[in-house]
Amino acid sequence: MHLTSREQEKLMLFLAGELAAKRKARGVKLNYPEAIAYIASHLQEAARDGMSVAEVMQYGATLLTVDDVMGGIAEMVHEVQIEATFPDGTKLVTVHNPIR
């Protein structure tokens, strides 16, 4: 199987997001890379599931709370940006202040 660089990136993001989700489910507070991966992977899947850009942006702000991450992480994450594949093409999605 041959994967393009973009496909490899998406797969790595998915894998990091899955690891973060497992840690979150165990009650482990997420660090910076885990929080970004968790949010970004969920945004990718939401876009793939058919949500609109606006819906994905709103959804992204509901995924993590301050209690889900280590101290100071929420203040470090000002925005999360991904290129997501929607039914009508690839679009840039930005979620501002995603950890509330």
Swiss-Prot record:
Recorded catalytic activity of this chain's protein: urea + 2 H2O + H(+) = hydrogencarbonate + 2 NH4(+)
Domain of life of the source: Bacteria
Pathway(s) where this gene product acts: Nitrogen metabolism; urea degradation; CO(2) and NH(3) from urea (urease route): step 1/1
Its EC number(s): 3.5.1.5
GO BP terms, alphabetized: urea catabolic process
A Pfam family assignment: Urease_gamma
Protein name: Urease subunit gamma
Species whose genome carries this gene: Actinobacillus pleuropneumoniae
Gene coding for it: ureA
